């Protein structure tokens, strides 16, 4: 039986490129090499495409994907050179220029099927402010928030925040993930400093009401038919679940399934599917919720390319549902091909 080519894109231009490499290495080891051969391409911080390794069998434990320290300029290619007939692309890219519709539009221009959400849902879900506005209309509960866009009246934004929210608040770049650039502010001075920090990563800033809550996550899989997982819980060993704790120090543990009442579990799964559909989602996503002591549920964010390392919540949630990491990858490829075929059929 001939194998299908699975193209892994990893690295990228965003601050989350380290996570991308870890995710891609996990995917390359979990792939069923009876069904796929894998070709990998590293995207540098400057946006260059580098042809890296190819695998026809499971790589050894010490095999690492090539990155900035090991690639050579002679390996650089034109981005369009990744095209291969009958291949499917898995863009294991997190954050801006990877998860925001940019790479998805590029792949659609090349007529390449790909894993994950389409251009529209990727770009909307990447922007936390736009996501909030759409989910408000859809009736999905969220914590109170304000926003600031660079160039607008900063003093007015601070005043609105002081009026509508109470400290502590969380200040986030609207278009970043993995806790990059996020700060907790306990007073007005810290709020202003947090806005300055967030502006280094984005020109659109979300300011959210801080809540004392458990962090519960639900996996989503599907196109027209949407499946969800039982929730899992992030059990933090640090005060703030930041990028360093999440990916570098690994100072978190997870309870899968989360220890929550059945009615809470059911409601979260319903909200997750509702949010996914409201944003036009397809392929996959992870929906992150807050659960307060009084039982209130708030949707925090919807991540269209969640971490894919062997210790990441998304694949572990599906393993708990009986879908192995390897079979999850197969299912994502099928869903990606299905969406590609549908897009092509609409071009009449």
From Swiss-Prot:
GO terms for biological process: cell wall organization; peptidoglycan biosynthetic process; regulation of cell shape. ATP binds at residues 162-217. Mg(2+) 1 binds at residues 288, 301. The keyword Nucleotide-binding applies. Pathway: Cell wall biogenesis; peptidoglycan biosynthesis. It comes from the Bacteria. Mg(2+) 2 binds at residues 301, 303. Residues 132-334 form the ATP-grasp domain. GO terms for cellular component: cytosol. PROSITE patterns: ATP_GRASP, DALA_DALA_LIGASE_1, DALA_DALA_LIGASE_2. InterPro entries: ATP-grasp, ATP_grasp_subdomain_1, D-Ala_lig_Van_CS, D_ala_D_ala, Dala_Dala_lig_C, Dala_Dala_lig_N, PreATP-grasp_dom_sf. GO terms for molecular function: ATP binding; D-alanine-D-alanine ligase activity; metal ion binding. Its EC number is 6.3.2.4. HAMAP family: Dala_Dala_lig. Belongs to the D-alanine--D-alanine ligase family. Cell wall formation. This is D-alanine--D-alanine ligase. It comes from Streptococcus thermophilus (strain ATCC BAA-491 / LMD-9). The lineage of its organism: Bacteria, Bacillati, Bacillota, Bacilli, Lactobacillales.
């Amino acid at each position: 039986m001939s194998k299908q080519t699975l193209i892994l894109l990893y690295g990228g231009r965003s601050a989350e490129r380290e996570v991308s490499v870890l995710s891609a290495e996990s995917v390359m080891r979990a792939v069923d090499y009876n069904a796929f051969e894998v070709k990998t391409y590293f995207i540098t911080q400057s946006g260059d495409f580098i042809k890296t390794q190819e695998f026809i069998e499971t790589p050894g434990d010490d095999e690492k994907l090539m990155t900035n320290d090991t690639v050579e300029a002679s390996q650089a290619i034109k981005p369009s050179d990744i095209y291969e007939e009958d291949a499917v692309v898995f863009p294991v890219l997190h954050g801006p220029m990877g998860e925001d519709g940019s790479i998805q539009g590029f792949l659609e221009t090349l007529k390449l099927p790909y894993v994950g959400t389409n251009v529209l849902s990727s770009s909307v879900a990447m922007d936390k402010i736009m996501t909030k506005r759409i989910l408000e209309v859809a009736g999905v509960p969220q914590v109170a928030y304000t926003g600031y866009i660079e160039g607008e009246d900063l003093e007015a934004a601070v005043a609105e925040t002081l009026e509508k929210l109470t400290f502590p608040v969380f200040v986030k770049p609207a278009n970043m993930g993995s806790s990059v650039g996020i700060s907790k502010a306990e007073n007005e001075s810290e709020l202003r400093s947090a806005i300055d920090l967030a502006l280094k990563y984005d020109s659109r800033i979300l300011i959210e009401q801080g809540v004392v809550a458990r962090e519960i996550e639900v996996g989503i899989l599907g196109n027209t038919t949407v499946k969800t997982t039982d929730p899992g819980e992030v059990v933090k060993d640090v005060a703030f679940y930041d990028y360093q704790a999440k990916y570098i120090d690994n100072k978190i543990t997870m309870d899968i399934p989360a220890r929550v009442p059945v009615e809470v579990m059911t409601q979260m799964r319903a909200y997750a599917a509702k949010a996914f559909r409201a944003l036009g989602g397809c392929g996959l996503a992870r929906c992150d919720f807050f659960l307060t002591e009084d039982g209130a549920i708030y949707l925090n964010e919807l991540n269209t390319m969640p971490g894919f390392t062997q210790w990441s919540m998304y694949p572990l949630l599906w393993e708990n549902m009986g879908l192995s990491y390897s079979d999850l990858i197969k299912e994502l490829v099928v869903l990606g091909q299905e969406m590609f075929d549908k897009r092509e059929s609409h071009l009449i």
